[in-house]
Amino acid sequence: MGSVDGDFEGLQAADRRAEVIEWLNALLPEYCLPLDSSDDELRELLSDGTVLCHIVNALIPGVLEESWGAYASSDQHAGHVKKFLAVVADMGLPGFSVKDLEEGSMSGVVDCLLVLRESVSSGLRDGTSKAPLRKKWRVPETGEPLVPGVAQGKTSPGEDKRNGLPDPKSQQKTPIFNGRKLREIFQLKRGSYADLPAAKISEMMHSNSLDNAPTQSLLSVVNGILDESIERKKGEIPHRVVYLLRKVVQEIERRLCIQAEHIRSQNVIIKTREDKYHSKIKALEILVNGTNEENQMAINRLQIIKEEKSKIEEKRKLGEQDVARLMKEKEISENTIASLKKEMEVMTSMHEQQLQKIELTAKQMEEHLTTKIKEVESLLVQSNKKIEEVEAASLLKSQLWNKKEGIFQKYMNSQQLYVKGLRISSWSIKNEMHALEMELRDEMSNFGSGLKCLVDAAENYHKVLAENQKLFNEVQELKGNIRVYCRVRPFLPGQDKKSTTVDYIGENGELLISNPFKQGKDGHRMFKFNKVFSPFSSQAEVFSDIQPLIRSVLDGFNVCIFAYGQTGSGKTYTMSGPSTSKQDWGVNYRALNDLFDISLSRRNAFSYEVGVQMVEIYNEQVRDLLSNDIAQKRLGIWSTSQPNGLVVPDASLHPVKSTSDVLDLMEIGQANRAVGSTALNERSSRSHSILTVHVRGLDVKNGSTSRGCLHLIDLAGSERVERSEATGDRLKEAQHINKSLSALGDVIFALAQKNAHVPYRNSKLTQVLQSSLGGQAKTLMFVQINPDVESYSETISTLKFAERVSGVELGAARSNKEGKDIKELLEQVASLKDTIVRKDTEIEQLQLMKDKVKSPSFAVDINGASMPKNSNSDLRSVLSITTNQQSQLSDPQSYAEVNRDGGPTSYTDITPTCLDEADFEDNASEDGFSGGTDYSVGCAAGASVFPNSCSDRTADTSIRRISSRIARFSLTKNGQPATSRPKPKDTAPKTPNQTRVQSSQLIGGSSLRASKRWQK
């Protein structure tokens, strides 16, 4: 093992030596010492101290300003080493001994150089200055001639031999070129080589200065001459400069050849040393294999020790478990003792109070008796004195004293009787105190019974108050008022909780807001809503109040819930929740989860189908959040109530079966939603998010259907631009958000004033909410406010808007239920539409083939019979009437109602009657209609090509059957026929284009595709 450790230490020392050599080659490339050099080779390079001085000057330029020649005495070499050691000592670094450099171990020298490298590199990183060190070691120049040695790039003598350079001793007789003149030539500025005299160039050539010059200097001379030739206009160079350039290039080529030869020799040396290291490695492997048995024995002993250690640890764990169990038992006993002590202290305090009262009474009696006894004792003392005086005075008066003794005896008896009476009176006083205590207890019990009566009366008052609130809510529901729930956001971490604008939150929806800038009565304002949630209300508490409203969706009612408030007030927190954990679920997740639970409990009586749409309104554009298409087309909005309840029919509708499906879709929608960072909120919603849940129910027993629609809307926050510090895209988003919220305020104001015209078309948001705000739906609004003082103005404006919303009466909501007969009727109408679409397609194909041979006024069929082109208009008119009757049956009240946007609406008058095909397509794209089958002008005329075909007969039979059923179902309860909307008399006759547009709308429109989604 000892030999292995020694070899390892030797390898480690070799690695450190190679690291120092690599650093020296990078710092002084002219030496180029091989990396696998031994300690002797490194000592040979560093022994004269010249390289050490060059290292100091290279790391800290100017510290030792002196040239060191290749030929110097041993004393000068020792002086160079001492200078290096002095510089290292002044830097506060460990040095080495001169003997180590001469014949000792080189480990100290290697460590010193590594520490010097690390110190200088760390000093350069820290930006420390070396100016004091330079000033301290600045050596004045001497008059001795400088031999161009290592300072000008000359290597040491040993290195000269290895590199094949001529020995400097053979060049002692050559003329020595002064170093200062050499620097003058090599440091000439651009454009001055041509002015260099020939005598100086010849002197430099004959003095052999090019052999001693550094390679970098020679390259700089070449570059300078070439640059000067380029800058000259004619490119002429003097012959002396050309000669100088040739000599410099030859010198560079010679050095490159020498360097290549040196590299080849070094490769041979490296190969031999690599073989030597391989042999050493094999020897080390043999040594390692020999120690395997010892290692196995040590491993066995270690395994036994580990087993004993594991046993000890198990015992220690058992002991710790016993200690923990005893500690728990001790804690339980201590808690029991503490509880008993508390009970004992309570009982002791009660007894002490009673005892103090009794002791006070007894003390008073004792004091009174003590005074009486003292008086008796004083009388006894006086009597004894008198007896003694009488006995001492005269025995003659004994008889007199005997008489007096009898008198005193009687007096003592009377005094004893008096003391006995006092004792009896004390006992009577105690009995009176006991009687008083009993009376006090009776009075306390009577007081408790009276207090209980008061508590019962207060509970009855709260019950009556709750009943009144329930009746008020029922009245509000009958009126169709928008329910308004207010939720106060809690303070964020770091905010001052004392500076709040919310002064009071009542149990019945009262909210008192204080103005921090005003005092007195003017600084407070009271608001009244259906419910106010405090900052400490949980998500479950918020949902429990709106749960009955959401459950009515399964009964066929339309419900709309939207959150309104400024940016950062918690709208998304209320609607979606901060995370997908069940505890933090918002209204969206809880509503869908509740719908699935109820549908599961009713599965024996009803069958429900649930579909989810999720869109957003971003910069007045409707985008589908559940679509995989990134470059989405613009989605349209239906401004009228459709039979299938779809407001945005082109948005993707995803059927869901469980809560997990909803969570996956909501994650996709939240990831696609537009959010951004503002000064008010790090993740601010930059769009209006609309989650629509479509529920279709089927009664298993009677086959009737119900359709409910739940809109869960998370509005973007209203914000002031100066507070949000929005710029660029954020400013544009804020402008669109404020514009849409302003349009919503205009709609609410018009509804509150009951105006005939309600501006729903001013914004995409109000178009989506038209079906909810326009009546026939249960609507609820969450108002989110910030309690901090800085948001006071936004809070007041938000609450004023909510107060205006709470006064809007929408009318009683209606259930969208359809009987079994109506369902069959709708299915027959859908099949009839499909038949007409197929027939029109066939007619269009045949018409294109026969257009050239047909007359403009009549169309000839295959058998030669002719008939008018508009013979198919009867079929289309019946289809139009059927569609109108269908809308009456599915929604009887909406047929007679007047659209708040300016007039009555139905399917037949959605399309303008005075527009051509291009105008209709433009308007349809603006209003959100997606076009169906495109009919040409000849399509209407081609309806008479096959008048006696089987398809016509089947269609006529279906129309007659549907018309009879419509006539039967259109009667009211009193047996009177239902009134239909009168047709305007001044309507212009329909053109073929108008007929084509209406047939396209009725047969191939997006309403047909949307209705089929629920029939799959």
Swiss-Prot record:
Recorded superkingdom: Eukaryota
Coiled-coil regions, chain positions: 288-354, 820-852
One Pfam entry name: CH
Gene3D superfamilies reported in the protein's UniProt record: Calponin-like domain, Kinesin motor domain
Gene Ontology MF terms: ATP binding; microtubule binding; microtubule motor activity
PROSITE patterns according to UniProt: CH, KINESIN_MOTOR_2
Matches recorded under SUPFAM superfamilies: Calponin-homology domain, CH-domain, P-loop containing nucleoside triphosphate hydrolases
Domain Kinesin motor: 481-808
Keywords annotated in UniProt: ATP-binding, Coiled coil, Microtubule, Motor protein, Nucleotide-binding
UniProt domain Calponin-homology (CH): residue ranges: 14-121
GO BP term, example: microtubule-based movement
Residue ranges with Polar residues bias: 884-893, 990-1004
Annotated segments matching region Disordered: 123-176, 884-912, 971-1016
Binding residues for ATP: G565, Q566, T567, G568, S569, G570, K571, T572
UniProt xrefs under PANTHER family: KINESIN-LIKE PROTEIN KIN-14J (PTHR47972:SF14), KINESIN-LIKE PROTEIN KLP-3 (PTHR47972)
Family: Belongs to the TRAFAC class myosin-kinesin ATPase superfamily. Kinesin family. KIN-14 subfamily.
Protein name: Kinesin-like protein KIN-14K
Protein's organism: Oryza sativa subsp. japonica (Rice)
Taxonomy of the source species: Eukaryota, Viridiplantae, Streptophyta, Embryophyta, Tracheophyta
